[in-house]
């Protein structure tokens, strides 16, 4: 699932980078081709299988996932891409934290000409409003947008291609960020930094969705 997201992301990046100047989307086939190439490159770099996938032929599993990448990339080209005129794509940013031993770095998927900050996702279910309202990632992106442009983001957005067993759809959930959110982010960074410096690494709570073989790359080595 993670690798197919990498593939779709590669297709989006390929299109949006040229759209900054051209103001036109590439043909769908070009976007899909870039997505498949990104997926294949990710697979070549290594992958892990769930227990269910391990019981199947590996080539069949990879072929099935490639088909999903094609479906998702087609939807991206048809529904997501036309909605945005990008001004920055995969924008690296470093936020210097005063009186802090470390800086905060991130890469913003897309900033557009309406001062919107967009995080593209692929998932098996729709995102909730709570997902957007509480996303630390979106808060970091909004802070980075303000640092880069001097302006508040008009909107932060989770724009997700949702793939279920029966269909592929688009889901958009929007939120906003302000000064109070940035203060809360700074406090969170301070807590995390203190934990790192003191060597306190709290394990995930068993039973949470990310503490599973499907979503955690460290599942096989976790004590």
Residue ranges of model-derived segments:
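RecB-family 4Fe-4S metal-dependent nuclease core
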Residues: 1-223
């Amino acid at each position: 699932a993670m690798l197919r997201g990498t593939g779709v992301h590669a297709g989006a990046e390929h299109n949006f980078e040229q759209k900054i100047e051209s103001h036109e989307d590439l043909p769908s086939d070009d976007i899909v081709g870039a997505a498949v190439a990104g997926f294949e490159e990710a697979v070549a770099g290594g992958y892990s299988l769930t227990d269910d996938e391990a019981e199947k032929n590996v080539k069949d599993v990879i072929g099935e996932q490639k088909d999903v990448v094609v479906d998702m990339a087609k939807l991206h080209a048809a529904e997501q891409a036309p909605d945005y005129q990008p001004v920055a794509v995969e924008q690296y940013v470093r936020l210097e934290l005063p009186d802090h031993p470390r800086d905060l770095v991130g890469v913003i998927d897309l900033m557009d000409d309406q001062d919107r900050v967009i995080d593209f996702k692929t998932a098996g279910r729709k995102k909730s409003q709570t997902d957007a309202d509480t996303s630390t990632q979106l808060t970091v992106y909004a802070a980075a947008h303000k640092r880069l442009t001097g302006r508040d983001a008009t909107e932060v957005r989770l724009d997700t291609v949702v793939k279920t067993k029966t269909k592929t759809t688009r889901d958009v959930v929007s939120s906003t960020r302000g000064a109070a959110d940035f203060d809360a982010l700074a406090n969170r960074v301070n807590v995390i930094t203190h934990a790192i410096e003191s060597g306190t690494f709290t394990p995930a709570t068993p039973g949470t969705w990310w503490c599973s073989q499907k979503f955690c790359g460290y599942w096989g080595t976790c004590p």
